[in-house]
Regions:
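Conserved mixed alpha/beta catalytic, RNA-binding, or beta-rich assembly cores of soluble enzyme
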Residues: 76-139
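Active-site helix-to-loop segments that bind/position phosphate- or nucleotide-bearing substrates
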Residues: 1-98, 102
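Composition-driven recognition of glycine/serine/threonine/acidic- and proline-rich low-complexity segments
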Residues: 65, 71-98, 147-181
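General structural feature for long, well-ordered alpha-helical segments within catalytic domains
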Residues: 50-57, 117, 121, 125, ...
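Catalytic cores of large soluble enzymes that bind and process phosphate-bearing ligands
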Residues: 46-49, 106-109, 113, 190
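Short, structured protein-protein interaction patches enriched in aromatics and acidic/basic residues
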Residues: 132-153
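Cysteine-cluster motifs in flexible loop/terminal segments that predominantly coordinate metals
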Residues: 170-209
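Generic secondary-structure signature for well-ordered alpha-helical cores
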Residues: 63, 126, 130, 200-203, ...
Length: 209
């Protein structure tokens, strides 16, 4: 069974085509493994009964899809927003009413699910672009203006910025996915012809300034 829903191949495009690129959306199906649950329990020194609680929470969370909104900024960077959606916010609110341990574990499992989503997104990017993801540059809420500027470039209605500068749904991340040709070293620079007229200040252009 595919772990990716609605994936469309993106053909290599010119700088002009990239600047006019539209926001696309796909859904990733992610799961938290038993090994990851054991690691969470070891890290937090939990006992067997608390491991059962982790397993129960993970099963509840398994029905949560990971939504990804993406748009190429240039041939070497993909602007990406990844979210667990408002249904997860509701679930966290309900589990948070039980006790502090349950609330903490539920929160940790959500971040683990997002982390698993990064790997699935890396696999999806290779299918979509023929390139590999070599790095992720997270855009944090420490700079609300920058956060708003990047999020505005994604045409979508699910994610918004709250007055305090945080994104909603709460389990949402925004980042730039660095792309490189799929070769052994993954260090090949972008062709000069592709980047010559590109206005996006990615690492390739910064190195030449």
């Amino acid at each position: 069974m595919s772990l990716i829903q609605k994936s469309e191949h993106i053909e290599p495009a010119s700088s002009a085509a990239l600047s006019a690129a539209k926001t696309e959306m796909l859904t990733l199906i992610c799961h938290i493994s038993h090994t990851q649950l054991l690691q969470l329990c070891r890290t937090n020194k939990l006992d067997a009964k608390q491991l059962q609680l982790c397993q129960q929470l993970a099963r509840q969370l398994s029905s949560c899809p990971v939504h990804v909104y993406y748009r190429p900024l240039c041939s070497t960077q993909m602007l990406t927003a990844m979210t667990l959606g408002t249904q997860t916010d509701t679930w966290l609110s309900e589990t948070g009413k039980k006790d502090l341990l349950t609330a903490y574990l539920a929160d940790q499992l959500c971040w683990q699910l997002l982390e698993n989503g990064y790997q699935r997104w890396s696999e999806a990017l290779k299918q979509l672009t023929g390139q590999v993801m070599t790095g992720m540059q997270f855009i944090g809420n420490d700079d609300p203006a920058e956060l708003a500027s990047y999020l505005k470039q994604l045409t979508q209605s699910e994610i918004r910025i709250l007055p305090g500068g945080c994104m909603q749904p709460l389990k949402t991340v925004l980042f730039l996915a660095d792309l490189a040709p799929d070769n052994a070293a993954n260090k090949k620079s972008a062709p000069a012809g592709v980047c010559a007229d590109c206005p996006h200040p990615c690492a390739y252009r910064k190195d030449s300034l």
